[in-house]
Swiss-Prot record:
PANTHER family: PROTOHEME IX FARNESYLTRANSFERASE, MITOCHONDRIAL. It comes from Eremothecium gossypii (strain ATCC 10895 / CBS 109.51 / FGSC 9923 / NRRL Y-1056). Its EC number is 2.5.1.-. This is Protoheme IX farnesyltransferase, mitochondrial. Belongs to the UbiA prenyltransferase family. It is found in: Mitochondrion membrane. The keyword Transferase applies. Residues 1-35 form a transit peptide. The keyword Mitochondrion applies. PROSITE patterns: UBIA. It is a multi-pass membrane protein. Converts protoheme IX and farnesyl diphosphate to heme O.
Length: 435
């Protein structure tokens, strides 16, 4: 707004009023002001600046006035363009022009000088914990705790949540620290922090040690020793046995499935004894789910596993890989029925869970049937027909994988909804108004 007013006054000829509006922080304006003051002292007595029209004396020629006016206008226009760098003793600092490039570089100075944000410091360690997998492990423990027939407490729930999360983070951190050379060879794992050099293997081990000790201590103090022992054993099973067997034998998948079955046992043991058969149905559910989920995932990246040196069923025995995925998909039916049979859920859970289990079993069956056809003698020796069949097998494997991602939370949520006794109040006569 001041710039617009000054421009108007320049063109209208009221230069002194213009110099009152334009701030005296630009050297060119200071020069213009001094020039005007010297010229005015020869024409009339000194007076304060005001907005009145300039009175010209008779002895001032038109050429002289025009020359002074041109100098002042040029100085004012230069100031309004904000690109004058002329030094002046009237200012306590040098005026320097700053372009957009310097401003952009200035914004990046804190990062360039080594000052990192909290996310830049903590981000690699959060990735070490495999947050999505850790959340799934933590939720499976919480769901099992919620399904327990015994009463729950807030302290136990918080301790179980934090302790299970830290134990899972510890196991995943050790796993990444042991396999950077192998993870570097797979597209799926190339972005891991140890592979990218954001964290060294030793830093990953230290992170895992701190997480594991704190997590186990929280489970011991806030829940009970049984849950703490299960949490510590899960760290050892995943980071040592499973990780070591990945490069030796296909049985590694079965060991990995055990680590997925332990969190439900931890949740159940937080409030109830492990002698109840219902908790083993929950553990079996998580154990069986690992196979259709992982076998179909590994099928589509089987060549990467092979090149990285991981011994997986997907490339060692493709027919067995598909058969195992179907076998454990079908095992979901009796396990869910067992939850109703042993009084964990009501009888309607058998219907709901059968629909969800049937959805995954359908795609697992198509995957197995296609692989069985692809590796038959007639098709396997025909390269064109085999390649055509593998395209379909890849599609069915991908379908089964994504169905499994939705299947597990659906089955667990339905179990909580159908927990035994949850809806008894709706059908009871307690609290009924008496006429």
């Amino acid at each position: 707004m001041p710039a617009l007013c000054a421009t108007y006054l320049i063109h209208s000829g009221n230069l002194r009023a213009c110099l009152r509006i334009v701030p005296l922080t630009k050297p060119s304006v200071v020069i213009a002001y001094r020039h005007l003051s010297k010229s005015s002292s020869k024409i009339a007595p000194a007076a304060a600046l005001n907005t009145a029209p300039i009175e010209f004396t008779p002895n001032t020629s038109a050429a002289s006035l025009h020359e002074r006016s041109t100098v002042i206008k040029d100085a004012a226009r230069s100031a309004l363009r904000c690109n004058d760098t002329t030094p002046t003793p009237a200012l306590p600092f040098d005026v320097k022009r700053v372009d957009k490039a310097n401003r952009a570089a200035g914004r990046k100075l804190p990062a360039a000088s080594g000052v990192l944000s909290a996310y830049a410091l903590m981000g690699p360690y959060i990735q070490l914990a495999k947050p999505r997998l850790t959340v799934l492990v933590m939720l499976s423990a919480i769901c099992s705790y919620a399904l327990s027939p015994y009463p729950a407490t807030v302290l136990e729930l918080l301790s179980l949540t934090v302790g299970t999360t830290l134990c899972s983070a510890a196991a995943n951190g050790i796993n990444m620290g042991r396999e950077p050379d192998f993870d570097r060879q797979m597209m799926r794992t190339q972005a891991r922090p140890v592979v990218r050099g954001l964290v060294t293997p030793m830093q990953a081990y230290k992170f895992s040690a701190v997480s594991g000790v704190i997590g186990t201590a929280i489970l011991y103090a806030g829940v009970n020793p049984t849950v703490a022992l299960l949490g510590a054993s899960n760290i050892v099973l995943y980071s040592w046995f499973y990780t070591s067997l990945k490069r030796k034998h296909i049985i590694n998948t079965w060991f990995g499935a055990i680590t997925g079955a332990i969190p439900p046992l931890m949740g159940w043991a937080a409030a109830s004894p492990l002698t109840h058969p219902g908790c083993w149905c929950l553990a079996g559910l998580l154990y069986a789910w690992q196979f259709p989920h992982f076998n179909t995932l590994s099928h589509n990246i089987r060549n990467e596993y092979k090149n990285a040196g991981h011994v997986m069923t997907a490339w060692k025995n493709p027919k067995l890989n598909a058969r195992v995925a179907l076998r454990y998909s079908l095992l979901m039916f009796p396990l869910c029925f067992g939850l109703s049979y042993y009084g964990i859920t009501d009888w309607t859970y058998q219907i709901d869970s059968a629909l969800v289990n049937g959805w995954m079993s359908f795609w697992a069956f198509k995957f197995w049937w296609q692989q069985r056809y692809n590796y038959s003698k007639k098709v396997y020796n025909n390269k064109a027909e085999f390649n055509k069949g593998m395209v379909l097998a890849n599609v069915y494997a991908r379908k089964t994988f994504w169905v499994s991602v939705l299947h597990l939370p659906a089955v667990l949520i339905l179990a909580i909804v159908h927990k035994k006794g949850r809806w008894d109040w709706l059908f009871s006569d307690e609290g009924k108004l008496v006429a």
